[in-house]
Structures are given as C-alpha cells and as structure tokens.
Amino acid sequence: MKIAIIGAGIIGVTTAYELAADGHEVTVFERHAAAAEEASFATAGMVAPGSVTPWAAPGMPAKVLRSLLSRHAAVRIGRPLSAGDLAWIWKWRRACKLETYLANRARLQRLAFYSSERLRQLSADLPLEYERSEGYLMLLRSGKDLQLAQPALQVIRDAGVAFREIDAAEARRIEPALNADTALAGAIHLPRDEVGNCRQFAMGLKIGAQLLGARFLSNTTVTRIGRSVPATLYVAGEARRRRFDALVLCAGVASASLLKPLGLSVPIAPVYGYSISAHIREPLNAPLSAVMDERYQVAITRLGQRVRVAGGAEIGGAPGHKRAASLQTLYKVLHDWFPGAAQLSNGVQEWKGARPMLPDGPPVLGASGVPGLWLNIGHGASGWALSCGSARVVADLIAGRAPAIDLEGLGVERLLR
C-alpha cells in the first residue's frame, strides 16, 4: 500500500521502519528540518518497562498538591492554564481511581515489555549506535524515601522485573562516582533495564527505513486530513491534496488539532519535561549508566561522552518559556550525586519538551474510525520505551494480522465512552 505517516518523532520513525519492512510505499511528513526534533529530542533515555505506569494513580492528586509547596517540586502548574488544560486535569483526576489505574497499568506494561523485546530485536538485526548501556539504580536518600518507594517496588514485583534492594555500599560499588557526601540510605538495582539516546536511535532507524524505500519530507507541515476514500491530506503551501491508501497519525501534541475537524476529540495535552545535557569533564566522576533520584524524580544518565539530567512534569504555561526553578532542580541533583562530572561553564544544552499525554495514561493505537486513518498517539513521557512495540502493533493491524499482544483498552474507543 501507499502509506503516509504524519510526524517523524520516535513514534513516526519506528512506524515508518516497520511499514517499510512490510513492503509498503511509505512517505513521512515532518514539519521540522530533521527527525526527532520535539518530544524525542533530549529525553532521559530510560527504557525500563517495569516502571512504565500511568501518571493517573491513586493518591496522585494529593501528592501533586503537596509538591506545589516545594521549591524543587517534581510536578508544577504553569500559567496561564487554558480551558483545555483544566478539562484535561479534570479527566486525569477521574482516572486516578484504583480500578482505572490498575487496568491502565496492565495495558501499559503489556505494551512496554513487548516494546522492549522489539527494541532488542531491532538492535540485534541492524547496525544501530545509540549510546546504549544496561542497568540503573533508584537512589533512596533516606528511610522515608524507601518507604515512599514501596508502591513503585510493588509494581515492579507484580511485573516480574528482576531487581535487588541494596545498601548504600553496594550502590556505590555499582556506581563508584556517587558523591560520598550526599546521604544515601540504599538503592534499588535494576540490572536488565537499559538506557539509550532516543534521538540517535531515531536518526539511525530513519536511515534503515530509507534503505527500505521510505521517503522523509522535512519542513513539510500537514495542515488538514480529509475524510475522502482513498485517504487524503493537505500540505501547507500546496493547493492540491495528496492521496494515499492509508494515513498513520504520529504527530504528538499536534495530533489533537488534526483530529478535531474529523469529529474526533482526543484529549492530548502537552505535559512539559526538562533536561540538561553537558559534556563529561572527568569520566571518573560521571555515572557508568543511569540513576534515578526517587525524592526529586530526576534521572541522570550517561550518553556516550555526555551526561543528561532529566525530570519534571509541568502542566500549562507557555511552550517557549523555560522555568528557571525546574532547571535549577536538575543542576542541584546532578551536583548532589556527581559533582565535577560535567562541563557546566559552557556548552550546556537546556531543553524543554512537550510530551503528548492522555489523561489516563496509555496511548491510542489502531483504527481511528475514519476510513483509512490509523492512530499511534498519546505516549506521554514513555514514547521511547513504547515506540518499537507500538510501531509493530500498528503495522500488523494495517496488514490485517493479529498483533503479538492483547490490545484491550488501547483503541480510540477507550476515549469515546
């Protein structure tokens, strides 16, 4: 089939590869000059399927309210809040019920573990270099942090993930550069989870897709999707519509505005995350793989010759404005654990990305209800961890094959009830 993909983030690129590998004629439309320029650009890089859970969870509304009083809050409310932001927050709050959370957690983890398997298969089959390393530590500063981490540990246990609860001495043996002056009560070691550069993987897989015949059209903005059969789309600056046998929407936050004229109201909201990336100044002072500070919900990862520090969740506010306090938290956590590791006097990349999040957590995969239009949207902060599996699922559905996992609750009908 002749298939168009809208969006060349990690979701669009993996989808392009899987469809091209299936023998389809694939064209990818990307509004930026290169792939993975938005939410996929400077992520933490964690691929930890056992830790992929809905943000909508019991107790989270109260936790968010308490965190707003902290200077280094993991969750922040930006200004201004639009009507859409307020509606999203209301739906998110409703999804925090225990029954809803458990169902969505099961859906996410089915997809996350399958995606991890698919990522490993692609890495074995293709010459992809993406600064990969294995294993990470969840750092617990105090006994209270260990107590607060118990719900997350139970999730990991339930998922059957291999992990060890270790003391501070063992944690420092695994990551020798951890600052001895920062209090550490213990840690959780997850040896099989991995870290990798999401954008670098996307760029490498894009080449793989191109070798299979996929075309990538950069600086090309899709302004509208038609309802006609065969499927059609309209590109900015072009008077004539383009026709395809099928369209796959992978446009992140922009997906909602493209779907609305078709009668599909999909509540995707940008939940902003932050990261800083800096060159390593002294390798002996840098992490070997990755750590997660559980108190501040900040990840520190080693990506080749750089250190990346990522965290935060910000609802509302202006897309182009970087909140100074959010960035300061990242610098603080880096200094707490790995002082002197990074060259911070110049060349630091500070990034704010809009993660396309649905209120209840899981993405939407599969048929849209509009003839010829397929969806691969709403992966939130887990796009990197879910991308390879989501792409394979959508390719299988388009081909009329049964996917390898149960897709209950991952279709668009979940949002239209």
Q: Which sequence ranges carry the predicted segments?
A:
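N-terminal Rossmann-like FAD-binding beta1-loop-alpha1 element of flavoenzymes
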Residues: 2-28
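Glycine-rich FAD pyrophosphate-binding loop
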Residues: 21-41
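Dinucleotide-binding Rossmann-like beta1-alpha1 core, especially the glycine-rich loop
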Residues: 42-168
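Active-site substrate-recognition segment that forms the wall
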Residues: 45-46, 51, 55-94, 222-232, ...
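Short beta-strand to alpha-helix junction loop
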Residues: 103-116, 138-148, 188-207, 321-329, ...
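Helical element adjacent to the flavin cofactor pocket in flavoenzyme catalytic cores
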Residues: 147-159, 181-245
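C-terminal catalytic lobe of FAD-dependent flavoproteins
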Residues: 163, 192, 294-295, 335-417
